[in-house]
């Protein structure tokens, strides 16, 4: 062993023992550990009669960590623990640690997530100065905040999400008048509260779980039913051919009338009797379905391909344990939200393209030319042809091919 008991991240002095030769890399031997950077370890506790060990989750650490009796916090065999390093040991002696936190039993729901969070030092709590900055953010939208915004509160507006959705960040409104669909897609205006360069903004850049304090994500930035909320809205006027004839991107104030789920809306569209509280919205959902079908037909006409791949959904019990795995159902409700969001994205992207403003676009690269030729040859062996134009392929050509192949054996 040429590591001298060093741990990942240690700063070491190395002596070269063999130089690179052909495919063989240069080899060295650690002669001195200059600095230890690892201060704690996450792993599985293993208990013996008079002492214990922590078996590290990090597979780059090839040593177990010794736990002296009385320094294990009464951890049990198989518990996931966080342990502080007391002695780094050496090449002949295992490092010594003290258990400072028990994350839970190894197979207990949630323990795996906590283990990853602790291992990588992912921040869970917000710094106090960030929490203090929330004091200036109101619990409800104030009258002053509504000034200068388009008032959309008189329009029937709904959110449609999964049953387990917590942060409701988009809503839909739709009316039809004189042959024109007036579609509004409203996104919670988080930037009104999280200003660029603010403490909240800087903290959010380094976070995922959660990115923003719950006061924002579950509160004033969540489009909860029955409360005024600030939104950024894309208002689109669409004719009966599915063409946008006018649009506006603006700051609005909205009030969601109902929180709906995909299941509820799908059942209503399938003809189920709507609960009393939703009866005033049945015509809205039918109108949404009508527009969704129109948009989908128009996209299909330009060659769009519907990659309807099967997805799985894991059902958990109240303790977070998986009890069922079932196919994720794509319904008329999920499709209409997909269609409206796609149309919104296209509209906004085109707006900023013509304004020549800096913008982040999601662009799919054209297929590799060599792979296309190989694919075309493969298809020819089965009696199908693929027409290439300028060494690439138009989506419409793929759409036609899939249509011909569908149902064949």
Language model feature labels by segment:
Residues 12-37, 100-102:
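Short, structured interface segments
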Residues 32, 36, 40-409:
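Conserved, carboxylate-rich catalytic/transport cores that coordinate ions
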Residues 2-5, 16-22, 85-91:
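Short, charged beta-turn/beta-strand-edge "cap" motif at the junction between a beta-strand
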């Amino acid at each position: 062993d040429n590591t001298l008991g060093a741990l990942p991240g240690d700063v070491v002095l190395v002596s070269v023992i063999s130089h690179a030769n052909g495919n063989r890399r240069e080899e060295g031997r650690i002669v001195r550990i200059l600095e230890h950077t690892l201060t704690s370890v996450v792993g599985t506790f293993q208990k013996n009669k008079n002492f214990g060990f922590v078996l590290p989750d990090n597979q780059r650490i090839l040593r177990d960590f010794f736990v002296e009796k009385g320094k294990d916090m009464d951890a049990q065999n198989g518990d996931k623990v966080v342990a502080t390093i007391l002695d780094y040991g050496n090449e002949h002696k295992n490092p010594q640690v003290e258990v400072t936190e028990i994350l839970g039993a190894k197979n207990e729901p949630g323990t795996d997530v906590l283990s990853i969070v602790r291992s990588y030092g992912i921040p869970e709590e917000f710094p106090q100065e960030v929490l203090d900055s929330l004091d200036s953010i109101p619990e409800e939208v104030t009258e002053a905040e509504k000034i200068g915004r388009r008032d959309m509160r008189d329009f029937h507006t709904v959110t449609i999400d999964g049953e387990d959705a917590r942060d409701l960040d988009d809503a839909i409104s739709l009316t039809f008048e004189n042959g024109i669909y007036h579609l509004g897609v409203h996104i919670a205006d988080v930037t009104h509260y999280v200003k660029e360069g603010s403490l909240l903004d800087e903290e959010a850049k380094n976070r995922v779980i959660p990115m923003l304090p719950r006061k924002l994500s579950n509160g004033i930035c969540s489009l909860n039913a029955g409360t005024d909320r600030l939104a950024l809205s894309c208002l689109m006027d669409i004719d009966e051919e599915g063409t946008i004839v006018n649009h506006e991107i603006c700051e609005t104030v909205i009030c969601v009338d109902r929180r709906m789920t995909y299941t509820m809306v799908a059942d209503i569209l399938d003809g189920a009797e709507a609960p009393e509280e939703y009866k005033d919205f049945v015509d809205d959902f039918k109108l949404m379905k009508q527009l969704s079908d129109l948009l989908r037909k128009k996209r299909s006409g330009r060659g769009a391909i519907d990659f309807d791949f099967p997805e799985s959904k894991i059902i958990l019990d109240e303790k977070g344990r998986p009890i069922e795995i079932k196919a994720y159902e794509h319904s008329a409700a999920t499709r209409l939200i997909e269609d409206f969001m796609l149309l919104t994205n296209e509209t906004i992207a085109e707006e900023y393209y013509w304004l020549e403003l800096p913008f982040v676009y999601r662009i799919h690269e054209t297929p590799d030319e060599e792979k296309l030729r190989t694919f075309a040859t493969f298809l020819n062996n089965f009696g199908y042809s693929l027409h290439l134009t300028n060494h690439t392929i138009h989506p419409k050509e793929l759409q036609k091919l899939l249509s011909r192949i569908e149902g064949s054996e």
